[in-house]
Curated annotation (Swiss-Prot):
Protein name as annotated: A-type ATP synthase subunit A
PROSITE patterns (UniProt xref): ATPASE_ALPHA_BETA
Classification via PANTHER family: H(+)-TRANSPORTING TWO-SECTOR ATPASE, V-TYPE PROTON ATPASE CATALYTIC SUBUNIT A
InterPro entries cross-referenced by the UniProt entry: ATP-synt_VA_C (IPR055190), ATP-synth_a_Xtn (IPR031686), ATP_synth_asu-like_sf (IPR023366), ATPase_a/bsu_AS (IPR020003), ATPase_F1/V1/A1_a/bsu_N (IPR004100), ATPase_F1/V1/A1_a/bsu_N_sf (IPR036121), ATPase_F1/V1/A1_a/bsu_nucl-bd (IPR000194), ATPase_F1/V1_b/a_C (IPR024034)
Domain of life assignment: Archaea
Membership in a protein family: Belongs to the ATPase alpha/beta chains family.
Subunit structure: Has multiple subunits with at least A(3), B(3), C, D, E, F, H, I and proteolipid K(x).
One MF annotation (Gene Ontology) recorded for this entry: proton-transporting ATPase activity, rotational mechanism
Catalysed reaction, written as an equation: ATP + H2O + 4 H(+)(in) = ADP + phosphate + 5 H(+)(out)
Binding positions for ATP per the UniProt entry: G231, G232, F233, G234, T235, G236, K237, T238
């Protein structure tokens, strides 16, 4: 619909509005509904009628109220000022809305996503007369002490630089260059549903180091990868996702709270301001973007919050940064889709979800990737996407979980039984998987330890064997097992409790460097190998359980993350010494 054409409301059904006299309107065009000019988006066109999903509360709308066309799609504002911001689902800055209308957002309130009056120190990197193309870097702004915000040519622009400003202070709407007669400003707009272009997709080679042992060591996630964290109520999805956002070794972290509790979002914001990034020594908020679309906000805006996060992530990816986007939770978005679909009277699919659930989820997850960007200088960037799924009753066979599993390449399945046992993170090592292991093996072997893959497979085999022995233990009891199996159960317990369990609220254990994780597993495996040797020499499991080094292994996660190599050397020596003295004692008794 071209700018200026006005339609009328024909029908209102919750967040869904049907307007008439809308001939010429386009799908996914933004409209303003009613006298309060509520933001909406056309999701379907039929004759002269347009089907609109409204991103604000529709209470009080009447048949015959005006609908104003804007002529453009829903677009994200991209430029300096994004980092550290808190937005709602349609990119309204929440701190500014609080100043304007208080704690409760009123209908029809509008605010610019990026400040127009703030001046940024711009440094040009191109000269007059140079040829430039899409996504070429023409300068940069020091947005935070951690993030250098590169100013890029819009993807639809190319030509010769006719004019470029000198170094100085400029707002995001001040012209900084002119290319073929077109003025370039620091602010860009990009439709949220349209993926940003890139030169080529590259193979995943590097892992996203999260500081969580169960993920980094057992089920690694590659940069540019896509993963899902499904889990029932109370299994720790939100805390796990917040941990990943806090400690992941990425340049930018985007946290999208999509239909979850407001208190959880508030908790995340408080902790991000307080915590320090171990890589840079600066506050975590200086590399983060927050999008809060809590459960009491309009359901239709859940979809835009997800796509807004992906668009901002792609923008920073195009600068050559590694970005992690976390969506908590995609199930709430799927529920919003189901509600809109029901009001549209579409044929329902499984459990009432629309038939296009899978393709809509794929359109989000497929925006991830490790890419070579357009433009000069040559650079690579990545967008890694991790989505929580909240299946009712922890039933992983429900449609949203199943549709997600067909798309993602890593699954971190949260287990209700583990959570009830206070085993956190409650990631079930028997169900979870990562298809990125082969991709990141070379990186682990070159940068961390050449024995990583072997250690990982040994540990997983022990945990698998423990699960097989559990049934037998229930029938005959642990004491009836052979000594080797008793040792295996003890080592499996050590892996579970001393390695996989990680305290998100412990000063040291909240984050574990990959090298420390490898040394921890080496300590457990050394205990297992020496234990097998001791059993062959006739030493009972009772004696092995009494060794002092068992207690030291249980406390190794509390070893500080700085200069831990010496502490582990000492631990390995203690384990060897304990077993040597045990074997000597056994030999002495045998001689007598």
């Amino acid at each position: 619909m071209s700018l200026g054409i006005t339609g009328k409301i024909y029908r209102v059904s919750g967040p869904l509005v049907i307007a008439e006299n809308m001939r010429g309107s386009k799908v996914y065009e933004v409209v303003e509904v009613g006298s309060d000019r509520l933001i909406g988006e056309i999701i379907g066109v039929e004759g002269d009628k347009a089907i609109i999903q409204v991103y604000e509360d529709t209470s009080g709308l009447r048949v015959g109220d005006p609908v104003y066309g804007t002529g453009y799609p829903l677009a994200a504002e991209l430029g300096p000022g994004l980092v550290g911001s808190i937005y709602d689902g349609i990119q309204r800055p929440l701190p500014l809305l609080q100043e304007l209308v208080g704690f409760f957002v009123k209908r029809g309130v509008k605010a610019k996503p990026l400040p127009r009056n703030k001046k940024w120190h711009f440094k040009p990197l191109v000269k007059q007369g140079e040829k430039v193309g899409p996504d070429d870097v023409i300068g940069y702004v020091e947005e935070t002490p951690v993030i250098k915000h590169y100013i890029m040519i819009p993807p639809d622009t190319h030509g010769v630089v006719e004019e470029i400003v000198g170094e100085g202070e400029y707002t995001i709407v001040d012209p900084i260059a002119r290319i073929n007669g077109k003025e370039i400003v620091m602010l860009q707009k990009w439709p949220v549903r349209k993926p940003r272009p890139y030169r080529e997709k590259l193979e995943h080679r590097e892992p996203v180091l999260t500081g969580q042992r169960v993920i980094d060591f057992f089920f690694p996630l590659a940069k540019g990868g896509k993963a899902a964290i499904p889990g029932g109520f109370g299994t720790g999805k939100t805390v796990t996702l917040q941990q990943l956002t806090k400690w992941s070794a990425v340049d930018i972290a985007i946290y999208v709270g999509c239909g979850e509790r407001g208190n959880e979002m508030a908790d995340a914001l408080h902790s991000f301001r307080r915590l320090v990034d171990p890589r840079t020594g600066k506050a975590l908020v200086e590399r983060s973007v927050f999008i809060a679309n809590t459960s009491n906000m309009p359901v239709a805006a859940r979809e835009t919050s997800i796509f807004l996060g992906a668009t901002i992530g792609e923008y920073f990816r195009d600068m050559g940064y590694h970005v992690l986007m976390v969506a908590d939770s995609t199930s709430r978005w799927a529920e919003a889709m189901r509600e809109i679909s029901g009001r549209l009277e579409e044929l329902p699919g499984e459990e009432g979800y629309p038939a296009y659930l899978g393709s809509r989820l794929a359109s989000f997850y497929e925006r991830s990737g490790y890419v070579k960007t357009l433009g000069r200088p040559d650079r690579t960037g990545s967008l890694t996407i991790m989505g929580a799924v909240s299946p009712p009753g922890a039933d992983f066979s429900e449609p949203v979980t199943q549709a997600t599993l067909r798309i993602v390449r890593a699954l971190y399945a949260l287990d209700v039984n583990l959570a009830y046992r206070r085993h956190y993170p409650a990631i079930n090592w028997l169900i979870s998987y990562s298809l990125y292991v082969d991709n990141v093996t070379d990186w682990w072997h070159k940068n961390i330890d050449p024995s990583w893959r072997e250690l990982r497979e040994k540990a997983l085999a022990i945990l698998q064997k423990e699960a097989e022995l559990e049934e037998l233990v229930r029938l005959v009891g642990a004491e009836a097992l052979p000594e080797e199996d008793k040792l295996l159960l003890e080592v499996a317990r050590m892996i579970r409790e001393d390695f996989l369990q990680q305290n998100a609220f412990h000063e040291i254990d909240t984050y574990c460097p990959p090298r420390k994780a490898v040394l921890m597993m080496k300590a457990i495996m050394l205990f297992y190998e020496l234990g097998l040797e001791a059993i062959k020499r006739g030493i009972s499991m009772e004696k092995i359980r009494e060794l002092k080094s068992r207690v030291k292994i249980a406390r190794m996660k509390e070893i500080p993350n700085i200069d831990f190599e010496d502490a582990f050397k000492s631990l390995f020596e203690d384990i060897r010494r304990d077993f040597e003295s045990l074997m000597k004692e056994a030999e002495t008794i045998a001689e007598l």
